[in-house]
């Protein structure tokens, strides 16, 4: 089969929701395909029935679209020319290929029970072989026992690897990689439950869909020689492989599900009201850089600039501060009506306009704006630990409650500084603490005004 058109794919399992690692993989495959005017495909690897999560497939597809990663083909918009887009719908196709391998003598039925496999593994460990390699000559059972296990269907099917054979590929990211068959051993292609294993099914899928390039995480490097074995056994052209760098936290430690220093699922960002392209823009620069080292890029720019030769093999740090820097940049461009819709506030439009004008410049997500809004919608009146000093007393004296406006508040702040000969933090911090109950915040006069005259009067009520 001659592959001329660039076709890439993202093939998640519906065993969980879209993770930043999976999203980065999908994005790179999308950008790569579109850079070369090719096709980007999403298919679902759902043969691990026990681990599939309800809503897992929908989460993958919906969140990809939210990130503005649109597949040319998927379970939602399949192309019948390339077969099914869910592995669970392709079992007959996998069995067809297995029969070919069995007839060629390139695969065989293995009748080992779980107990016998564990015994074989224990014997290898006793010999100092800690990476298990199946020995096809280990099991000694009678023909009668074989017939019994055949009837009971208690067997798996393994691929028969050639002796001392090198599987090698020129990795797009890491260069030439070579693995010998003696370091792999015959591996299972059809499990005893008659479902295909990942490393077998994925090759059939990639061949059927004419995938030209496979970009995926570095954890798949050990899978690649196994997959090459299937390509060679079937006499199929193999795709170009590229294994993307690991994503770590800001300290360089591999991400784990218990690591709360990073928002790890795309749905978290969606729920928190991040602008979707902020995430995509940041993910695009985890393991890849443009020649001009530009950081803010539209989708069109990324597609144009996505040179695979600039993929990095060094681990990429996911820094929430940097992520929020992107969030802040893109939030400034959002349509104000979207903000109103997300905030769901009963405040009048004029007040909301000023609130957004005041808090938006420092916000990185809509949920952050909503948190600030709650402080104004449900304000505390007293905060006992607030210390009242001369600055606050003078500010209260200078504040004109009869003409309560942003301008009058600013004049009161300025006059207080002049009267007491103070400025900077010594001026602003006591006033901010006494009026807003916060150490930090946006432009002080606006932050005070948004609470309204009555709340500020009550908060300054005990100041004499």
UniProtKB/Swiss-Prot annotation:
Residue ranges annotated as motif 'HIGH' region: 12-22
Similarity-based family: Belongs to the class-I aminoacyl-tRNA synthetase family. Glutamate--tRNA ligase type 1 subfamily.
Assembly description: Monomer.
Name of a matching Pfam family: tRNA-synt_1c
Annotated localization: Cytoplasm
Taxonomic superkingdom: Bacteria
EC number: 6.1.1.17
Binding-site positions, ATP: 257
Species per Swiss-Prot/TrEMBL record: Mycoplasma mobile (strain ATCC 43663 / 163K / NCTC 11711) (Mesomycoplasma mobile)
Function: Catalyzes the attachment of glutamate to tRNA(Glu) in a two-step reaction: glutamate is first activated by ATP to form Glu-AMP and then transferred to the acceptor end of tRNA(Glu).
UniProt motif 'KMSKS' region: location: 254-258
Cellular component terms (Gene Ontology): cytosol
Protein's UniProt name: Glutamate--tRNA ligase
PANTHER family on file: GLUTAMATE--TRNA LIGASE, GLUTAMATE--TRNA LIGASE, MITOCHONDRIAL-RELATED
GO molecular function: ATP binding; glutamate-tRNA ligase activity; tRNA binding; zinc ion binding
InterPro entries named among the record's database cross-references: aa-tRNA-synth_I_cd-bd (IPR045462), aa-tRNA-synth_I_codon-bd_sub2 (IPR020751), aa-tRNA-synth_I_CS (IPR001412), aa_tRNA-synth_I_cd-bd_sf (IPR008925), Glu-tRNA-ligase_bac/mito (IPR004527), Glu/Gln-tRNA-synth (IPR000924), Glu/Gln-tRNA-synth_Ib_cat-dom (IPR020058), GluQ/Sye (IPR049940)
GO biological process: glutamyl-tRNA aminoacylation
Keywords tagged on the record: Aminoacyl-tRNA synthetase, ATP-binding, Cytoplasm, Ligase, Nucleotide-binding, Protein biosynthesis
Catalysed reactions, semicolon-separated: tRNA(Glu) + L-glutamate + ATP = L-glutamyl-tRNA(Glu) + AMP + diphosphate
């Amino acid at each position: 089969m001659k592959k001329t058109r660039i076709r890439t794919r993202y093939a998640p399992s519906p065993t969980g929701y879209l993770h930043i690692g999976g999203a980065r993989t999908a994005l790179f495959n999308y950008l790569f395909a579109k850079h070369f005017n090719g096709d980007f495909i999403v298919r679902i690897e759902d043969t691990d029935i026990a681990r599939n999560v309800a809503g897992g497939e929908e989460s993958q597809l919906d969140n990809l679209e939210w990130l503005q990663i649109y597949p040319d083909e998927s379970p939602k918009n399949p192309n019948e020319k390339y077969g099914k887009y869910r592995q669970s719908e392709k079992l007959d196709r996998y069995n067809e290929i297995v029969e070919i391998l069995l007839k060629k003598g390139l695969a065989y039925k293995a009748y080992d029970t779980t107990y016998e496999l564990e015994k074989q593994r224990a014997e290898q460990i006793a010999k100092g072989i800690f990476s298990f390699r199946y020995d096809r000559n280990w099991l000694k059972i009678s023909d009668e026992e074989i017939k019994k296990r055949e009837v009971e269907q208690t067997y798996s099917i393994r691929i028969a690897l050639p002796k001392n054979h090198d599987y090698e590929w020129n990795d797009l990211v890491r260069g030439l990689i070579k693995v010998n068959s003696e370091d792999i051993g015959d591996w299972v292609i059809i499990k005893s439950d008659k479902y295909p294993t990942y490393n077998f099914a994925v090759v059939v899928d990639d061949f059927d869909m004419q995938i030209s390039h496979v970009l995926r995480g570095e954890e798949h490097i050990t899978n690649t020689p196994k997959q090459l074995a299937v390509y060679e056994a079937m006499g199929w052209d193999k795709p170009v492989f590229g294994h993307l760098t690991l994503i770590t936290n800001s300290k360089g430690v591999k991400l784990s599900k218990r690591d709360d220093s990073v928002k790890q699922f795309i749905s978290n960002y969606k729920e928190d009201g991040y602008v979707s392209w902020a995430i995509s823009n940041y993910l695009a620069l985890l393991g890849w850089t443009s020649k001009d080292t530009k950081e803010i890029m539209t989708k069109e720019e990324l597609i144009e600039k996505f040179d695979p030769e600039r993929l990095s093999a060094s681990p990429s740090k996911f820094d929430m501060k940097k992520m929020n820097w992107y969030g802040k940049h893109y939030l400034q461009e959002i349509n104000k009506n979207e903000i109103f819709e997300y905030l769901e506030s009963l405040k009048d439009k004029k007040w909301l306009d000023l609130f957004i004008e005041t808090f938006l410049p420092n916000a990185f997500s809509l949920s952050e704006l909503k948190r600030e809004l709650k402080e104004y919608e449900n304000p505390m009146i007293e905060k006992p630990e607030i210390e009242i000093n001369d600055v606050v007393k003078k500010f209260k004296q200078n504040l004109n409650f009869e003409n309560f406006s942003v301008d009058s508040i600013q004049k009161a702040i300025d006059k207080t500084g002049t009267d007491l000969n103070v400025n900077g933090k010594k001026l602003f911090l006591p006033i901010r603490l006494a009026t807003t109950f916060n150490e930090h915040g946006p432009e002080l006069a606006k932050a005070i005004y948004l609470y309204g005259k009555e709340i500020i009067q009550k908060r300054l009520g005990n100041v004499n």
